Amino acid sequence: MECTVSWTGNAGTRSGMGFIAETGSGHVLAMDGAPDASRPENGGQNLAPRPMETVLAGTGGCTAYDVVLILKRGRHDVRGCSVRLTSERADTDPKVFTRIHMQFTVTGRGIPPAAVERAIAMSHEKYCSASIMLGKTAQITTGFEIVEA
């Protein structure tokens, strides 16, 4: 896996904190920083997600992918899946994630709660490299609801 991240500044001015990531699979992702009122030249313009937001989003994508795949392989009638991630970070540098809660909503027909619980556990214990890495610094908790469709 590879990725190239380039500083773009704000709208090409080279004065902000905008970045573009180009992935090895040919996709592009924009990132930006929060505005800094005390030093505007060092802040972003809030035009794109912050880098750590992309880490959190990537973790959500990784685990949701696993959960859907595991449920489908178990021949469950899964029709939708979303995960809402909330987090806390350390107050001092490096501001690593210290707590992450993942709340899954799985939509389908006749999906047993035990199957969803198992899929989430398998993702977090075996398959989702992102959540396994973040679990080294953060306490990760999960919850789920099943919506009958």
Annotate each language-model stretch with its function.
Residues M1-A57, V68-A149:
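Extended beta-strand/beta-hairpin segments
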